[in-house]
């Protein structure tokens, strides 16, 4: 055994062993308990960042621990390889996205391997490869034929210069991020998944996920947004509108119907179009609304604006004429593109009515009283007793809901209904680097799915996009084809799928990644699924996790999987944060400096008082800790850390610095501390092994001192087992091992029994650290004379008898103050403990002249003597 800890050699040897032995390749083993551990697969952006390292280390610790529990563990890895960053990089570097992506995958794979992950690389999937997306297209055609996927017009952000559709995040202050052109809203045909058909089940089956964080489930519940309300119809005022009809609105507050003072419609609503015919001002306003963002979040924060029309509708219960306004806060794709405005009890309506001097009529008695003067108060939105509502006065919310529904039903102008905030999932993207949508457009036959035998529709990989629209739409060699039904010349769909589609089913493909008979081999899928432990960032709480749950139900209904949910347990790991440093330039901009380029200045108490740039010695500002990001230049390159300290040190620091679900603050001194600890473990083991391995430990003949050491060993096993196995508190498990090391380093090594005890201690350290620092544990296990690899060893068994103490140290208090300690046999009775405490020298001193009123004995811990 080498005298010094040499992580590079140790880690290379361990990884070579695992590769040669195919240690982590698994197959279905009927009868053996399975465990499927999965971390969200990475986007191949170029190189790993510390967030990746943390995510994959957490998954690896759990996987290795479960293997030590005797389970057949699957931990696969792949690449979420389609997406816009590849197109942007391609335009910047004039290189095909495919080439850029595959080069990044190759580099990042070597980085992941250097971490020593227990990954079954034989199951690797890459979502931009035809052998993967072929099955996505196969499922698409089946769902299209069933009507679960359909085509309709959708509103998008259109860049008139680049002639392309932009995602909401590519629209900056109403302009295209690349061209700077003013963005228009356009209606274009798009494909949609009918996720709303599963809304009830997606909501209800959240209750079947006790292993998910409550926060994530709440976010999904809110996103699905089930609400019971009323569909109310306002008859057209025929004198102003010129025809009969009704304006439909949905409201969750029908109790406030008598307080409606106007109605507002979206810019795209037919009444807005009608009103604008001879109104240039309204036409200009509608065009402005259509140029705004289509994102709901932007709508909520933007200034409320509107224009009146000359149109009116009638109140369904009073017949009163209400003016129709066009407003920018009404969304065409929510409800029916119209709202009944009750300014007294809705904040948006209040803001709008106050701005345009519209009537505000209070109809609910709230904790703020019977009036609703400006400014808006949250109390105005409360439920309460109805006022100013005619026959409905005095009713509470449930009573008013029912009574108003009866009144509306009599007039055939309304009824209660359940509505969801969730909208069908539009998956068409006018982009190149994505999975082609397998549809052919025929003038005679309409939209025809590509037949199964013609799949996959392969995306050409030698294309360099230029940012002006989809390259596929300019490639006749791609889109010209024959109709599969009638044989006539037809046109292939040139849109590609949202990249969230690929990540919605990848976890299932890992069960049978090379299966040629379908999307999954049902037998393999049902063997491994659902995933036992899924790990990823909370930022995926809604979209990815909701879409994956939806896809799982689609696959179930296609007979591909038998379970209802994809992920049994979910761990959302915290961010990796680090200090930021900057200088503010003369023009007001910020220049950010990497922590590695900054030197800290400290006072005599080691408190940081300033910082300066190493290169010029001039001061920089300390910006506080933030998430590691390119924009703040506060990232630490994992590769340089691994090269300097080794993967085990990085893994140990990551797991020790904080619990996995909390933010982790990067600390160079913390990394150095982790490295020092591993050197201590190595040093103790090396000194022990160099003297030759001892014989077996004879537990029956241990001295009291030796029993205390063995108790420390088994106490560490007990605590670490709870921390790792039940709570994923890897940081406290590591602390237990550190405490044990303190004991072992001080343990005597004079006798054969002493050395046999140290052998048990070192074996325990190796086993407890094996999931966290697998390379050094692999080496130590062999050096300690153990046969077989540590990855095939079981988690250390707890010997409960080792925890039993012959004698106990008890604290003595007089009137609650510490006055001494006594050592008592563990078997001592309460009376014996009390007698020993009363006769203790210190107790006698502090109770002299006092009467002992009461003696409280807390078994195994303390004695408190109350005297006065």
UniProtKB/Swiss-Prot annotation:
PROSITE patterns: AA_TRNA_LIGASE_I
A Pfam cross-reference name: Anticodon_1
Residues reported to bind ATP: 630
Localization per Swiss-Prot or TrEMBL: Cytoplasm
Motif ('HIGH' region): 42-52
EC number: 6.1.1.4
Assigned keywords, A-Z: Aminoacyl-tRNA synthetase, ATP-binding, Cytoplasm, Ligase, Nucleotide-binding, Protein biosynthesis
Top-rank taxon, per record: Bacteria
Signal peptide: none
Any one GO biological process: leucyl-tRNA aminoacylation
Reaction equation(s) it catalyzes: tRNA(Leu) + L-leucine + ATP = L-leucyl-tRNA(Leu) + AMP + diphosphate
Motif residue range(s): 'KMSKS' region: 627-631
Primary residence: cytoplasm
PANTHER family: LEUCINE--TRNA LIGASE, MITOCHONDRIAL, LEUCYL-TRNA SYNTHETASE
Protein name in the entry: Leucine--tRNA ligase
Gene, per the UniProt record: leuS
């Amino acid at each position: 055994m080498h005298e010094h800890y040499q992580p590079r050699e140790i880690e290379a040897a361990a990884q070579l062993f695992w590769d040669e032995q195919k240690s982590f390749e698994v197959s279905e083993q009927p009868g053996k308990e399975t465990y499927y551990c999965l971390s969200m697969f990475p986007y191949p952006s170029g190189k790993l960042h510390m967030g990746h390292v943390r995510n994959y280390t957490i998954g690896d610790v759990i996987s290795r621990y479960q293997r030590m529990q005797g389970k057949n563990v699957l931990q696969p890895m792949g690449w979420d390889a389609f997406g816009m960053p590849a197109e942007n990089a391609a335009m910047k570097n004039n290189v095909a996205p495919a080439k850029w992506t595959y080069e990044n995958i190759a580099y990042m794979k070597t980085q992941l391997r250097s971490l020593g992950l227990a990954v079954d690389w034989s199951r690797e999937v890459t979502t931009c490869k035809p052998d993967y997306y072929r099955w996505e297209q196969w499922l698409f055609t089946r769902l299209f034929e069933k009507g679960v996927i359909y085509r309709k017009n959708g509103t998008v952000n259109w860049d008139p210069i680049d002639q392309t559709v932009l995602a909401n995040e590519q629209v900056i202050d109403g302009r295209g991020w690349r061209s700077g052109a003013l963005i228009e809203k356009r209606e274009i045909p798009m494909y949609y998944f009918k996720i709303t058909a599963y809304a009830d089940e997606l909501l209800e089956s959240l209750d079947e996920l006790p292993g998910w964080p409550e926060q994530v489930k709440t976010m999904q519940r809110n996103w699905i947004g089930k609400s019971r309300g009323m569909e109310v119809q306002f008859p057209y005022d025929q004198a102003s509108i010129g025809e009969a009809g009704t304006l439909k609105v949905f409201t969750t507050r029908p109790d406030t119907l008598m307080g409606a003072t106007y109605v507002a419609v979206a810019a795209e609503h037919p009444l807005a179009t009608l009103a604008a015919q001879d109104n240039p001002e309204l036409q200009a306003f509608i065009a402005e609304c259509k140029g705004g963002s289509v994102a709901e979040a932007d709508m909520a924060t933007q200034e409320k604006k509107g224009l009146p029309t000359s149109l009116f509708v009638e109140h369904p219960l009073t017949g009163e004429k209400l003016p129709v306004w066009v407003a920018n806060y009404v969304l065409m794709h929510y409800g029916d593109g119209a709202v009944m405005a009750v300014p007294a009890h809705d904040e948006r309506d209040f803001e709008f009515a106050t701005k345009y001097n519209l009537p505000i009529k209070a109809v609910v008695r709230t904790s703020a009283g019977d009036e609703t003067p400006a400014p808006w108060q949250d109390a105005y939105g409360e439920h309460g007793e109805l006022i100013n509502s005619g026959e409905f006065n005095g009713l509470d919310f449930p009573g008013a809901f029912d009574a108003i529904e009866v009144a509306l039903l009599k007039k055939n102008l309304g009824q209660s209904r359940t509505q969801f905030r969730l909208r069908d999932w539009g998956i068409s993207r006018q982009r190149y680097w994505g999975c082609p949508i397998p549809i052919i457009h025929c003038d005679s036959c309409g939209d025809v799915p590509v037949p199964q035998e013609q799949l996959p529709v392969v995306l050409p990989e030698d294309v360099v996009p230029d940012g002006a629209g989809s390259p596929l739409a300019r490639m006749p060699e791609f889109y010209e084809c024959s109709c599969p039904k009638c044989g006539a010349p037809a046109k292939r769909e040139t849109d590609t799928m949202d990249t969230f589609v690929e990540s919605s089913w990848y976890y299932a493909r890992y069960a049978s990644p090379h299966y040629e008979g379908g999307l999954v081999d049902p037998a393999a899928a049902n063997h491994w699924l659902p995933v036992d432990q899924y790990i990823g960032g909370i930022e995926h709480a809604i979209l990815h996790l909701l879409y994956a749950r939806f896809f799982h139900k689609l696959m179930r209904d296609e007979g591909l999987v038998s379970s209802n949910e994809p992920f049994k347990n979910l761990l959302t790991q915290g961010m990796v944060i680090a200090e930021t440093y900057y200088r503010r330039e003369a023009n007001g901009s910020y220049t950010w400096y990497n922590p590695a380029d900054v030197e800290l200045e400290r006072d005599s108490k080691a408190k940081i008082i300033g910082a300066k740039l190493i290169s010029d010695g001039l001061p920089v500002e300390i910006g506080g800790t933030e998430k590691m990001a390119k924009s703040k230049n506060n990232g630490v390159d994992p590769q340089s850390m691994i090269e300097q300290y080794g993967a085990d040190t990085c893994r140990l620091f990551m797991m020790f610095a904080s619990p996995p679900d909390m933010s982790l603050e990067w600390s160079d001194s913390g990394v150095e501390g982790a490295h020092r600890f591993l050197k201590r473990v190595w040093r103790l083991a090396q000194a022990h092994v160099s003297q030759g391995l001892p014989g077996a430990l004879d537990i029956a003949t241990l001295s009291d001192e030796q029993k205390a050491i063995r108790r420390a060993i088994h106490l560490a096993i007990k605590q670490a087992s709870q921390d790792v196995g039940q709570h994923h508190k890897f940081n406290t498990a590591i602390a237990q091992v550190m405490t044990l090391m303190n004991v072992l380093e001080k343990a005597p090594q004079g006798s054969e029994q002493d050395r046999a005890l140290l052998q048990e201690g070192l074996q325990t350290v190796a086993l407890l650290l094996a999931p966290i620092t697998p390379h050094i544990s692999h080496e130590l296990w062999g050096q300690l004379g153990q046969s077989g690899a540590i990855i095939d060893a079981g988690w250390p068994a707890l010997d409960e008898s080792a925890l039993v103490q012959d004698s106990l140290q008890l604290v003595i208090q007089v009137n609650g103050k510490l006055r001494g300690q006594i050592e008592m046999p563990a078997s001592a009775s309460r009376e014996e403990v009390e007698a020993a405490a009363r006769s203790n020298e210190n107790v006698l001193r502090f109770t002299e002249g006092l009467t002992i009123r009461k003696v409280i004995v807390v078994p195994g811990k303390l004695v408190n003597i109350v005297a006065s």
